[in-house]
Amino acid sequence: MEKTYNPQDIEQPLYEHWEKQGYFKPNGDESKESFCIMIPPPNVTGSLHMGHAFQQTIMDTMIRYQRMQGKNTLWQVGTDHAGIATQMVVERKIAAEEGKTRHDYGRDAFIDKIWQWKAESGGTITRQMRRLGNSVDWERERFTMDEGLSNAVKEVFVRLYKEDLIYRGKRLVNWDPKLRTAISDLEVENRESKGSMWHIRYPLADGAKTADGKDYLVVATTRPETILGDTGVAVNPEDPRYQSLIGKFVILPLVNRRIPIVGDEHADMEKGTGCVKITPAHDFNDYEVGKRHALPMINILTFDGDIRESAEVFDTKGEESDVYSSEIPAEFQKLERFAARKAVVAAVDALGLLEEIKPHDLTVPYGDRGGVVIEPMLTDQWYVRADVLAKPAVEAVENGDIQFVPKQYENMYFSWMRDIQDWCISRQLWWGHRIPAWYDNDGNVYVGRTEDEVRQENNLGADVALRQDEDVLDTWFSSALWTFSTLGWPENTDALRQFHPTSVMVSGFDIIFFWIARMIMMTMHFIKDENGKPQVPFHTVYMTGLIRDDEGQKMSKSKGNVIDPLDMVDGISLPELLEKRTGNMMQPQMAEKIRKRTEKQFPNGIEPHGTDALRFTLAALASTGRDINWDMKRLEGYRNFCNKLWNASRFVLMNTEEQDCGFNGGEMTLSLADRWILAEFNQTVKAYRDALDSFRFDIAAGILYEFTWNQFCDWYLELTKPVMTGGSESELRGTRHTLVTVLEGLLRLAHPIIPFITETIWQRVKVICGITADTIMLQPFPEYNAAQVDEAALADTEWLKQAIVAVRNIRAEMNIAPGKPLELLLRGCSEEAVRRVNDNRSFLQTLARLESITVLPADDKGPVSVTKIIDGAELLIPMAGLINKDDELARLAKEVAKIEGEIARIEGKLSNEGFVARAPEAVIAKEREKLDGYAEAKAKLIEQQAVISAL
């Protein structure tokens, strides 16, 4: 094996070999249990970020673990067409390169442009996924707009429409005036903002008066421009100030519309003036009030968010109505919405109707992609009736057919599902699944899979002109079908039979409603088992937290704290990293701050660590459902782990290759250390499997680290040295056999988390074991063997380790050179301790560097020594001749003085009121921790001074 571990030399060639050999495919053995994970399809526009790397490491670990258990294993891969995101990327590209808009191209040519762009750039993310070692079946890769998935989408739409579970309605939606499309509640970002509350007088009609004799009501609003669309004023029915006015009318300023005063609990007596203007076409709460009181709806805005030339007037059901005039005063027509706000306020003021303006804190909705203020807009949209679909989906989680890990996410799921709103599924975009609905010139709607089908089913001749709906479906509509559409539905395929329901879904909690809930609803409606019972899409949902930076901040381009997972694999120089973080910024003014922070954090850029170290770190940080603060030090630690495993394997190979390791017969004698490591290994296998089976990847990673680093490398390899240098033939054979057997088993154990290094080493080790198989990927996963857990060997070795560590600690405390042989005395020994010394003298002498071991009678005072108590004996190391008493006392006095200086410095800091008041809690806690550490170190040094003074 190469002397040094260089991941960059082994990882890519190995992955190409695995893929070429077809190791990622299901084994096709239907007699075996199947195991299937559907990858959450990343956006085709995207590139790999830490969230992907985290989730995909978890998925690949599960897939490799199950594959090694012989299961028929499928990891289904694919990408999402990502409607808005992709359309925006391509629109920006043609604007920058050609100065054109999509309208210059026209719909068909623009869509061709997107397909062309996908062909050029769409492969970035899948190339990056290969770098992570993902063992997905690439031959089954799907795209949410490919032909099969498009057919599934049409099939679902048509069936739901025919069951009256999809309908078209005029409803209020979140409208993005920049992107000119409806967006979902989940794509709206609410931002806190300082604004104003305008108090405006609405004159009462027909000579009516308020309880205190005024001939007007004062209405408070944060959006005066929408006055033009008011159709009512609400007061609380319990409010004594206005009770007598319910059923009367006001005259709306500026447009002179006569609108009713209604009694509704939406009006809060304690807030503002207690009178609320009702604009059903431009506010979600007002829309509900309008429905309760049958108020008309007046839309005053264009899709760009400008004031219309004439309003659209509808009744409560959304039918066109002439109950009010559609006239809008000329001075407001075509004004941009925020300019209209100023103009309306000025006009109201000129009429003497502006009572006052108060500063007001408010929450403003922004589109998370377009970045502009969202308008509630009355539009014709397509909806799914969600309550019918939600019922079985709630029951599936209630009765345990689907389990969330961790369980607390079930509550989040229930709270949304039990109060579910109809789902708006249409989007005013060009890129996506076009809605399979056609209209004739009379406005009749026909739904079908194709235009031909529509004509046939409805007996429409070629002379009837039909035009297809311009809108596309919400991206999440096709994603909701992901678990079954990828397996060939609506055909009844073998893949669907073998792999559905799937086993586990790994997802971030942020898309539990967007995606998880909708998959459960859609799957249970369309997929039934042989008994007609609805099938769930998956049995377990494993929820991950978010990966944050080392300070707990969310990673984002605008903060400049994003770390590309592949930069940790391959390394990146500081100039390249700075370019990545500060180039093409939406907010260039942040660049300097980001540059300083990056230079401080990564003065030399990022070293290459390799994929395995990255995967190990991600697994180790995966505590269920919690957000993770990324830690570069942990990454370095796991890179060192890979190095340690590599070097340990070289040691094993150097001592076993071309040697008799007992695989072809011959007598074998196992030493205490051999029996101990086999027992430790089996206990590790049991605990590790339990951790993986319960999705505790963090615990599994910890178990693997502890066994490999501490037991196998630090102890067992050392304990083999006495046998290697002086053992009999059968003892040598036994130890070599154990070295190779445990290493080979350990490689299989670690393979799901760190696949590259384990395969590389295993290819060398398998030759010694006489294994002829091609790859570790398809080897059986280690199983717990209780017969190999030798309790006596475990107890004896733990005692030996205790004794060796005690001697090593004395060396360190007394500043004795590690190589200097020592005399060891044991006093007050139990019979068990005497037996352990006599049986394992060579281990003790070699590992503790002892020239002699003497057992003293219990009452023997012995020479002046440093002592340690261990189980069943007192250890003494005589000090005479080992150290120069005066020099050592002087050294210790110097150490004590240095520590006292540090203690005084920190105590001074902590007694400074200014520091304590200003410094963050974490900084103060760190200083206190340091203080405790120094106090402990000082106590130890004083103890040593006492021992040496007595010599």
UniProtKB/Swiss-Prot annotation:
Source organism of the structure: Salmonella typhimurium (strain LT2 / SGSC1412 / ATCC 700720)
Motif residue range(s): 'KMSKS' region: 554-558
Subcellular location, record wording: Cytoplasm
GO cellular component, one term: cytosol
Domain of life: Bacteria
GO biological process, one term: valyl-tRNA aminoacylation
Protein family (similarity comment): Belongs to the class-I aminoacyl-tRNA synthetase family. ValS type 1 subfamily.
Presence of the UniProt keyword Coiled coil in the record: yes
CDD domains for this protein: Anticodon_Ia_Val, ValRS_core
Protein name in UniProt: Valine--tRNA ligase
Record carries keyword Ligase: yes
